[in-house]
A protein has these predicted regions:
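Charge-dense, low-complexity intrinsically disordered segments
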Residues: 3, 42, 108
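Carbohydrate-binding surface patches
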Residues: 30-31, 36-44
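Residue-level recognition of the N-termini of beta-strands and the immediately preceding loop/turn
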Residues: 25-28, 131
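Internal alpha/beta scaffold segment
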Residues: 2-24, 33, 45-66
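A structural signal for short hydrophobic beta-strand segments in well-ordered beta-sheet cores
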Residues: 28-30, 90
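Rossmann-like S-adenosyl-L-methionine
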Residues: 46-172
Length: 172
């Protein structure tokens, strides 16, 4: 893991072990943007007020966004900071692109690796300005939008309605 995520491991261990029912948290998802980290705590039992305070304190002390997911994906909600902004963002500066995404969207958590993957894909494709490219499983547009800088036309296909909407927003 890379910073800032790797620096959260020890504090997360301390946080989880200090909760009243640590065994009811089977997973923590991590999402990283250029300037933000978000953690989604999947929990199988109601959180006590004391545990909620610990989560808020952790978010404040570590400067991370905190989300809870008590049931399915639709149950995910932000608990810290208490604002309406649920999106993170990352840039692909070589392509003049900024991507907004939800912590639940499928993205590469290591931004440096993501930039390298996109650059490598673009180089391997050796795109000609007359090319028309089809990107199956385009997600939020990570590869499609970078490729669109070079190709005549790019068509992205995606099953997730949320990802399709996010890709459209990112294309604007």
């Amino acid at each position: 893991l890379v910073d800032p995520v790797s620096s959260l491991i020890e504090p997360l261990i301390k946080l989880i072990s200090g909760l009243s029912e640590p065994r009811t948290i089977p997973q923590i998802e991590v999402a990283c943007g250029d300037n933000d980290v978000a953690l989604i705590f999947r929990h199988m039992a109601a959180m006590s007020n004391e545990d909620m305070q610990k989560l808020h304190s952790f978010g404040r002390e570590q400067s991370v966004q905190m989300f809870l997911q008590p049931e399915g994906l639709d149950s995910t909600h932000k608990i810290f900071p208490e604002d309406d902004n649920h999106l993170l963002h990352y840039r692909l500066p070589d392509y003049g692109l900024v991507f907004q995404f939800s912590p639940q969207d499928f993205t590469q958590v290591n931004l440096a690796v993501n930039r390298q993957m996109v650059a490598r894909a673009v180089a391997l494709l050796d795109i000609d300005p007359s090319d028309e490219v089809f990107d199956a499983f385009c997600g939020i547009g990570n590869f499609s939008l970078a490729i669109s800088r070079f190709a005549k036309k790019v068509t992205g296909a995606e099953q997730s309605a949320t990802s399709i909407a996010r890709a459209r927003d990112n294309a604007r």
